[in-house]
Regions:
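Active-site microenvironments that recognize anionic phosphate/pyrophosphate groups
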Residues: 1-167, 173-246, 251-254, 267-268, ...
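Acidic, glycine-rich loop-and-strand cores that form catalytic or ligand-binding grooves
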Residues: 261, 265
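Substrate-recognition/cap regions that form aromatic- and gly/pro-loop-enriched pockets
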Residues: 271-273, 277
Length: 357
């Protein structure tokens, strides 16, 4: 992997990740951009004890542009974009409309491919491995910033999820605090350790799922994907490395080598689970793509027991059947009590049925 760091016209950082060591990245950003002005603020909820980012400047962010005006495509034929080069492998840059900025953290955009019409599932194993390298490198770099407490790499896909740019891309949030979801995991981790005389909760969850077998979706030598026993979403899969590590930087070479094959197969199964159509005519390519969120859970940077935390990826869709979405209604949004219409065992069986031939 070759890494090239440069700056956009407004001073934001842009990083190219290339598979070839002899790739030269010399193009400059020729757009007449004003300096980025953000108003990001972290406010703490006194009742719930969590944090909310207030970011009013995001009201003006780019919203569903036509494909020929996509800001994440390479700069070609005189059309200037966020990426000055005419081509790229993987590109990462500071978000122009960040939810977190300055002392409140940092937000970055990760462009997986220059192909506007592709998706992560369309990548080759080598391309997926390069994205993993980029996630890992950014996790290491962002973890060194004094204001950053946790690094979150994720992908939102699909208009149903709320994606405003159709180009295949993900994001990285570097939070100035440990997120509420992770805090709850750490609390459960400590309680389990106390109750079992030192056993690790993540290790036990993975061992129990592998022993039961009913919710396993696929396994490799170094990774296991399963639908959790108490899945919140209709189709939700957790992907764990067999060897517990706290974050992406700690994965060994064997796990890194196997990851692309496992993850690409998992994403392709997600695209097949609703492939029978919705009864309203021929399916379009976009309709065949299941909307999802893919979220890497990593240990907080300076947590006292970070070595006990287990890196894992959670992949889920809000689609429950063809043409029908799982909306967060009163119980979920008002009280954070999820109601799942699809039994986890049935979801796992469906995801096994659509395995690649």
């Amino acid at each position: 992997m070759k890494k090239t760091t440069t700056r956009l016209a407004d001073g934001r950082e842009l990083i190219y990740y290339d598979s070839r060591d002899d790739t030269a990245r010399t193009a400059t950003d020729r757009r007449p951009l004003d300096p980025v002005s953000t108003a990001s603020e972290i406010r703490h909820d006194r009742l719930l004890g969590d944090a909310v980012a207030i970011a009013s400047h995001r009201q003006g962010r780019t919203y569903h542009p036509p494909a020929d005006q996509c800001p994440l495509c390479p700069t070609r034929e005189g059309r200037l974009t966020e990426i000055p080069e005419a081509d790229y492998d993987v590109a990462v840059f500071e978000n122009r409309f960040p939810s977190l900025a300055g002392d409140s953290g940092r937000c970055e955009v990760v462009c997986f491919t220059p192909d506007h019409d592709a998706s992560f599932a369309d990548l080759t194993p080598a391309q997926a491995a390069l994205v993993l390298d980029a996630w890992t490198d950014r996790t290491a770099a962002l973890s060194q910033l004094p204001q950053v407490a946790q690094v979150f790499c994720f992908e939102n896909r699909g208009a149903e999820i709320g994606v405003t740019l159709g180009h295949p891309h993900g994001q990285i949030y570097a939070y100035p605090f440990t997120t509420p979801r992770t805090e709850r995991m750490l609390t459960s981790l400590a309680a389990h350790r106390e109750a079992t005389g030192g056993r690790n909760l993540f290790d036990d969850v993975l061992a129990d799922e592998r022993a039961a077998g009913r919710r396993i979706v696929l396994e490799g030598d170094h990774w296991t994907a399963f639908v959790p026993y108490a899945a919140h979403w209709p189709y939700e899969v957790h992907l764990y490395p067999r060897r517990r590590v706290p974050d992406l930087t700690a994965l060994d070479d064997a796990a890194r080598t196997e990851f692309p094959q496992i993850y690409l197969e998992l994403l392709r199964r997600f695209d097949r689970i609703f492939d029978e159509g919705d009864g309203r005519g021929p399916r379009t390519p976009d309709a065949a793509r299941t909307p999802y969120i893919a979220a890497w859970h990593q240990a907080p940077v300076r947590a006292a027991d970070r070595a006990e935390f287990a890196l894992h990826l959670e992949l889920f869709t809000i689609r429950r059947t063809p043409g029908k979405l799982k909306f967060l209604a009163g119980s979920e949004s008002g009280m954070n009590v999820f109601i799942n219409d699809v039994p986890p065992e049935a979801a796992a069986e469906r995801l096994r049925e659509v395995a690649s031939k």
